[in-house]
Regions:
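ATP-dependent adenylation/pyrophosphate-handling site
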Residues: 66-115, 120
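Mid-to-C-terminal catalytic subdomains of enzymes
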Residues: 166, 171-187, 229-324
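A mobile, often basic/glycine-rich helix-loop segment
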Residues: 177-204
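Acidic, carboxylate-rich catalytic segments that either coordinate divalent cations
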Residues: 2-11, 161-162, 321-349
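Hydrophobic transmembrane helix bundles of membrane-integrated enzymes that assemble
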Residues: 1, 7-9, 26-41, 54, ...
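RNA-binding accessory domains that recognize and position tRNA/RNA substrates
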Residues: 1-67, 345-349
């Protein structure tokens, strides 16, 4: 049953960066899609040997020579995947063209060179976001995370090179404990809500709903929260949904080997809190790249801070008095939502 509730959708989008419930949509005639995890198909992981086996098997089953590429960042997750690819496989690295943005290309080149891969840089400009955002909104029927613009551009460039399949390493953070800031403590219920919401809806929306009901199923005694279960059900699905949208839109087959895995035992939170996030992945990286130091973790670079520095929404739905205290990534959510609402009003969705 499709329910129309613009206020619900706006509130959930600014808080969680997506709307998990497929049956609640912004407007009549629009229907969005959310990633569905198939738990019964996941491989159990006990050690790095198991991780290697799954990576090798999934890539072997997926790989078509001259038609398969990898999105390679400067981080360890995609670097590990790169080490199992045949020589001369195409690998793409994003580079945002703006002042002060982290450049991962030199680190990614070390991985590509180590395994004789064909390394290509994809430059990202604000003009790409202006150009691609409308067509992504038309496809998704809902506003989205900014990573989708980069993924869609990568797909378009890959297709020009004859690539039909792309491998990514998104899921390692979620399966193996890479979100170390969210795993840094046993959160109090209210503190976790404040920490997790991308934007508290009441801060930026004139009309909004309280989104705390999303957290209530995870509330524990003594005002604690099962943050691990929440992250698995909400954060993981949000990220996997972004990748699904982008690749399906561009009709590209994609593989995330890590998303096919689950740990056979609980994460060792003490190791993570002592400075070893993704301890199994770090161990495997050191095995595959014995001559390289483990790099610091950084998110996929996006120059939203620079590109949206002076952005102020014009629509009546938004409280503009708070816009300047938002980060660039937070402003992206408002920019994308405003673009979506404008397109709807013009009949362009």
């Amino acid at each position: 049953m499709n329910k129309i509730d613009k206020i619900y959708c706006m509130s959930h989008y600014v808080a969680f960066r997506f709307i998990k419930n497929e049956n609640i949509n912004f407007f009549e005639g629009l229907k969005h899609k959310t990633f569905q995890q198939k738990e019964n198909l996941l491989y159990e992981i006990f050690n790095i040997t198991d991780i290697e086996k799954v990576i090798k098997k999934t890539i072997e089953d997926f790989y078509i020579p001259n038609k398969t590429a990898l999105l390679l960042s400067g981080g360890i997750d995609s670097a590990i995947l790169a080490s199992y690819l045949p020589k001369n496989t195409k690998v793409f690295t994003f580079k945002c063209i703006a002042n002060g943005v982290i450049d991962e290309t030199s680190q990614a080149k070390k991985y590509a060179d180590a395994y004789c891969l064909d390394h290509e840089i994809i430059e990202m400009y604000w003009e790409d976001f202006e150009k691609l955002t409308p067509e992504i909104l038309q496809y998704n029927k809902t506003p989205f995370h900014s990573i989708e613009v980069q993924l869609v551009k990568a797909c378009k460039i890959a297709k020009q090179a004859g690539i039909e399949r792309i491998i990514v390493g998104d899921g390692a953070d979620y399966v193996f404990g890479g979100m170390d800031k969210l795993l840094s403590q046993d959160w109090d219920y209210d503190s976790f809500i404040k920490r997790y919401n991308s934007i508290e809806p009441s801060m930026i929306l004139k009309d909004y709903i309280d989104v705390s009901d999303v957290y209530k199923p995870y509330k524990l005694d003594n005002n604690k929260i099962d943050f691990m279960a929440f992250m698995k059900d909400i954060m993981d699905i949000e990220s996997y949904t972004s990748y699904m949208h982008a690749f399906e839109k561009e009709n590209i087959h994609y593989l995330d080997p890590y998303s096919h895995m689950k740990l056979a035992f609980p994460l060792d939170l003490q190791r993570i809190r002592n400075g070893e996030p993704k301890y199994l992945i770090r161990e495997l990286f050191s095995k595959r790249y014995p001559n390289l130091n483990i790099p610091d973790k950084i998110p996929m670079p996006r120059a939203t801070e620079q590109w949206l520095k002076n952005y102020v929404p014009k629509r009546k739905e938004f409280k503009i008095e708070n816009i300047n205290i938002l980060t660039g990534d937070q402003k992206w959510l408002i920019y994308c939502l405003e673009t979506f609402l404008n397109m709807h009003d013009k009949g362009e969705l």
